[in-house]
């Protein structure tokens, strides 16, 4: 199964994971059972949030991301999707569409409200953990 994971879930898993919270378990499931799809723009946003908002050293943020995405696939988005009520979230939809992702795992209400986009279901980390 191909999955795209939004920044909200990444940050919750990497920054706030004290033990075995839902975002951490979702990220672990994606790493061990599924294939993560990403793009340069998603990676840059994750690194930016970790370094600017949470004072991670850039090397630490980049290393964590590279290790997690080692089993993933990369797509090149063009920024042409204009669907989400928050334009900053359109990159997740475009990445999912180009990767032909089965799921977009999101904690962002602007994405979740859509329910699906071009064959990709948009679900919460809890729903992802319950999915086979």
Describe every region a protein language model picked out.
Residues 109-132:
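Acidic, PIN/NYN-like endoribonuclease modules and their adjacent C-terminal/linker elements
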Residues 22-23, 61, 88-89:
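Amphipathic coiled-coil/heptad-repeat helices and related helical stalk/stem segments
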Residues 1-38:
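Short, well-structured N-terminal submotif of metal-dependent ribonuclease cores
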Residues 70-104, 109:
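Active-site neighborhoods of divalent-metal-dependent phosphate/nucleic-acid chemistry enzymes
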Residues 27-83:
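PIN-domain endoribonuclease scaffold, especially VapC-family toxins
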Residues 6-7, 38-39, 107-108, 124:
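A secondary-structure boundary/capping signal
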Residues 12-14, 49, 114, 131-132:
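Residues that scaffold the ATP/ADP-binding catalytic core of kinase and kinase-like folds
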């Amino acid at each position: 199964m191909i999955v795209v994971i939004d920044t909200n879930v990444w940050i919750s898993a990497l920054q706030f994971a004290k033990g075995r919270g839902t975002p951490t378990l979702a990220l672990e499931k994606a790493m061990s059972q599924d294939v993560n799809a990403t793009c340069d723009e998603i990676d840059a946003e994750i690194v930016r949030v970790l370094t600017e908002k949470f004072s991670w050293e850039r090397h630490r943020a980049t290393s964590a991301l590279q290790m997690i995405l080692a089993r993933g696939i990369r797509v090149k988005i063009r920024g042409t999707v204009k669907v989400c009520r928050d334009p900053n979230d359109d990159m997740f939809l475009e990445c999912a569409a180009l990767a032909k992702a089965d799921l977009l795992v999101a904690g962002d209400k602007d994405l979740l409200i859509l329910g699906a986009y071009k064959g990709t279901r948009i679900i919460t980390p809890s729903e992802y953990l319950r999915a086979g």
